[in-house]
């Protein structure tokens, strides 16, 4: 089912009485009163032997790039390693001040280090280094560019139960692994579930985790986020790993409905609801989802699914997960439903701007008490994976220049970082200039967009999400001064595709096939992701260098591009699109995809014929050109057509079909014999008209098309209800 993010989730809900508990005291008697043990440390002491690497790390080995988050006793930075063996690699560095940590927090920090050093799992964040100075503790972790699941919920991507199932299944495997090590997570909430750049999850923030000595041992300390707490945590009667499965149910409920199952007006009321309230079960959820939620929301932990001797296997066997291939899931072979919009390696677009806009500064720590250093004695760790099998350090990665991407909307001055050079091109809403980065002297292009004429947010998001494709222009930097947005991209040194082709002394049909194959693959990738370019004229297809190699082509200028969205303006996962999108929305998407294919057909025709199909030159009127386009008639005889293969003519005809819904799809273009059997194509030279005449005719064609339709205005998505509901609860750190 599509998941309705409800304003008020309780109408039409079945109230489910949760099982009464034997021996559980009421909230007034237990969980809602301050515990006399609250100040007593009851954490279990953990010691681990960790195999050391070749050298211990220290703060000087890391270059601070950005602040990612900040809490009451520390910060999280984006850092770059500057020493071998992993120089140039990006990490998240968690810095905790010893002097501001209470004793129980100090033990939690050492616990987090010990747990992470012992855990190696595809869905748990990896610890690479841990060390201390006189006043601080340092944890060096994976830098996960996709942000957290909290962000996904608050931005309300339209997803289905199948999509939620993917995240919950990966989460179940991660929790199962922690439980197998005797670790109770205890702080399971969306903020602590991060996404990598592909969209897979990683559990993080183990400050509240507890390592149990055995399955009979229970923990008693009061910890975690109250809305996600299990009843036995609330009433402090002791809890085991089954408390995590209650929190897992809360997370599942929230992801499926957009609301928390137990939330009062304050902390005390919320705790009372957790201990006593009947659960409102939304009837739009599948029977399988409702069944799993009921099995997880058992107030008696002994009756809760996942608490038995089989542990997580009970969860995995539930009918809700009948479609999951757990082995494929563990191997990360199942494609995530959502790909975060991240591009460059030091990209922090998905972290809170309140933190990322701050100048990174690792402030000196206050001298700690004498006892603090003893507590953290031996607190250092180097991941063994940073060593080769023979004990020699790994070769360093290619050096990364020190351009640090700036957040869109950060109000930094573009000219502080770049010197602007000559104009490259001018459009209706923007102009493009060459620029030089002051710190590195590297050349880029900058597209300066007038915000009063066009909202660039869709273009930025598409470039961030898909710009890592080898044949899509790469976004390097974004600035916003209020009036203009500056998009810094790689510089296209090789010029336009048609310029290069028509200036060649020899250009053959076989070479044209290689060009179309490269561009077709890129368009097929975009269409498969629900993105249509809608302005694929040859002047927007350029070479990144002067080699003329088809693999060096880039599709540029996504100013008219669109991502497939629901009627409410939200993005949709592929599962949502396939099952719940209105026919007229899909028809419109098919029309837009057909327009992209038509543009590729125009390009193919021009490469083969040496002239454009519907315009004779720049002096043709828009009316004349549109009449020819509307008739769907173009010549495939005379000139080059006398030597061009029949398969080429067949492909051109099917790409330029007058009915957009009868044109080939990008996938069908790639499967056409003219593309798949390049070695059979002629290598004879193709002639062409004068370059300026061809380019003038091409410009006239697209000018006529653009004059015949109004330009749609893209509007930014308003803040969601869920985001507003949870904004006051934003965590101080996402790591």
Curated annotation (Swiss-Prot):
Catalysed reactions, as listed in the record: L-seryl-[protein] + ATP = O-phospho-L-seryl-[protein] + ADP + H(+); L-threonyl-[protein] + ATP = O-phospho-L-threonyl-[protein] + ADP + H(+)
Domain AGC-kinase C-terminal: 322-391
Annotated catalytic residues: 187, 535
SUPFAM superfamilies the UniProt entry points to: Protein kinase-like (PK-like)
Entry's localization field: Nucleus; Cytoplasm
Stored SMART domains: S_TK_X, S_TKc
Modification after translation (UniProt): Activated by phosphorylation at Ser-221 by PDPK1. Autophosphorylated on Ser-380, as part of the activation process. May be phosphorylated at Thr-359 and Ser-363 by MAPK1/ERK2 and MAPK3/ERK1.
Highest taxon in the source lineage: Eukaryota
Chain positions with Phosphothreonine modification: 359, 573
An example Gene Ontology molecular-function term: ATP binding
Phosphoserine modifications at: 54, 221, 307, 363, 369, 380, 732
Keyword annotations from UniProtKB, A to Z: ATP-binding, Cell cycle, Cytoplasm, Host-virus interaction, Kinase, Magnesium, Metal-binding, Nucleotide-binding, Nucleus, Phosphoprotein, Repeat, Serine/threonine-protein kinase, Stress response, Transferase
Cofactor requirement: Mg(2+)
Subunit and interaction comment: Forms a complex with either MAPK1/ERK2 or MAPK3/ERK1 in quiescent cells. Transiently dissociates following mitogenic stimulation. Interacts with ETV1/ER81 and FGFR1.
Protein name: Ribosomal protein S6 kinase alpha-1
Organism of derivation: Homo sapiens (Human)
Organism taxonomic ancestry: Eukaryota, Metazoa, Chordata, Craniata, Vertebrata
Gene name as annotated: RPS6KA1
């Amino acid at each position: 089912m599509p998941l309705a993010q409800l304003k008020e989730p309780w109408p039409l809900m079945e109230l489910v009485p949760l099982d009464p508990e034997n021996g559980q005291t009421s909230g007034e008697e237990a969980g809602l009163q301050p515990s006399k043990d609250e100040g007593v440390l009851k954490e279990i002491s953990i010691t681990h032997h960790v195999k050391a690497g070749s050298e211990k790390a220290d703060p000087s080995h890391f270059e601070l790039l950005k602040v990612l988050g900040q809490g009451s006793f520390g910060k999280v930075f984006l850092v770059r390693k500057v020493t071998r063996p992993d120089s140039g690699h990006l990490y998240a560095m968690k810095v905790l001040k010893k002097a501001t940590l209470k004793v129980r927090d100090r033990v939690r920090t050492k616990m987090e280090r010990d747990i992470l050093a012992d855990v190696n799992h595809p869905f748990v964040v990896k610890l690479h280094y841990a060390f201390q100075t006189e006043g601080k503790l340092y944890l060096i972790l994976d830098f996960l560019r996709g942000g957290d699941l909290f962000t996904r919920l608050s931005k309300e991507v339209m997803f289905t139960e199948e999509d939620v199932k993917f995240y919950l299944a990966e989460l179940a495997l991660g929790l199962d692994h922690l439980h197998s090590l005797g670790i109770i997570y205890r702080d399971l909430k969306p903020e602590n579930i991060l996404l990598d750049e592909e969209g897979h999850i990683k559990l993080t923030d183990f400050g509240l985790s507890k390592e149990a000595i055995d399955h009979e041992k229970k923990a008693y300390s009061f910890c975690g986020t109250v809305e996600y707490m299990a009843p036995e945590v609330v009433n402090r009667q002791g809890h085991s790993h089954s408390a995590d499965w209650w929190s897992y149910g809360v997370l599942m409920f929230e992801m499926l409905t957009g609301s928390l199952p137990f939330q009062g007006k304050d902390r005390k009321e919320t705790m009372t609801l957790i201990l006593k309230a009947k659960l409102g079960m939304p009837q739009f959820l599948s029977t399988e989802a409702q069944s799993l939620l009921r099995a997880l929301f058992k107030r008696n932990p002994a009756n809760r699914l996942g608490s038995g001797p089989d542990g997580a296997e009970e969860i995995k066997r539930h009918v809700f997960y009948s479609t999951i291939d757990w082995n494929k899931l563990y191997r990360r072979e199942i494609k995530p439903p959502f790909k975060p919009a991240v591009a460059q390696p030091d990209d922090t677009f998905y972290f809170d701007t309140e933190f990322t806009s701050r100048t990174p500064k690792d402030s000196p720590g206050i001298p700690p008490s004498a006892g603090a250093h003893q507590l953290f004695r031996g607190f250092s760790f180097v991941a063994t994976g940073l060593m080769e099998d023979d004990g020699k350090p790994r070769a360093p990665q290619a050096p990364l220049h020190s351009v640090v991407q700036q957040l869109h909307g950060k109000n930094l001055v573009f000219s502080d970082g770049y010197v602007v050079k000559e104009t490259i091109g001018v459009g209706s809403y923007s102009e493009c200039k060459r620029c030089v980065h002051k710190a590195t002297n590297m050349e880029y292009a900058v597209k300066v967009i007038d915000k009063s004429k066009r909202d660039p947010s869709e273009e930025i998001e598409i470039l961030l999400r898909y710009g890592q494709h080898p044949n899509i222009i790469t976004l390097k930097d974004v600035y916003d001064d209020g009036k203009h947005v500056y998009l810094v991209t790689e510089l296209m040194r090789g010029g336009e595709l048609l310029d290069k082709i028509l200036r060649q002394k020899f250009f053959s049909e076989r070479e044209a096939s290689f060009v179309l194959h490269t561009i077709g693959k890129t368009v097929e990738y975009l269409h498969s992701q629900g993105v249509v370019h809608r302005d694929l004229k040859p002047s927007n297809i350029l070479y990144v260098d002067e080699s003329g190699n088809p693999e060096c082509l880039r599709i540029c200028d996504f100013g008219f591009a669109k991502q497939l969205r629901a009627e409410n303006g939200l993005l949709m996962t592929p599962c949502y699109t396939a099952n719940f999108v209105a026919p007229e929305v899909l028809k419109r998407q098919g029309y837009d995809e057909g327009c992209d294919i038509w543009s590729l057909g125009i390009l193919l025709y021009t490469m083969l014929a040496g002239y454009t199909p519907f315009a004779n030159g720049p002096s043709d009127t828009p009316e004349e050109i549109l009449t020819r386009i509307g008739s769907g008639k173009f010549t495939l005889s005379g000139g080059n057509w006398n030597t061009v293969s029949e398969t080429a003519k067949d492909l051109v005809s099917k790409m330029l079909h007058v009915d957009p819904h009868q044109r080939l799809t990008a996938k069908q273009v790639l499967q056409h014999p003219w593309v798949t059997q390049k070695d059979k194509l002629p290598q004879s030279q193709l002639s062409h008209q004068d370059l300026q005449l061809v380019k003038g005719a091409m410009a006239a064609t697209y000018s006529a098309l653009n004059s015949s339709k109004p330009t749609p205005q893209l509007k930014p998505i308003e803040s969601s209800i869920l985001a507003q509901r949870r904004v006051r609860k934003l965590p101080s750190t996402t790591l």
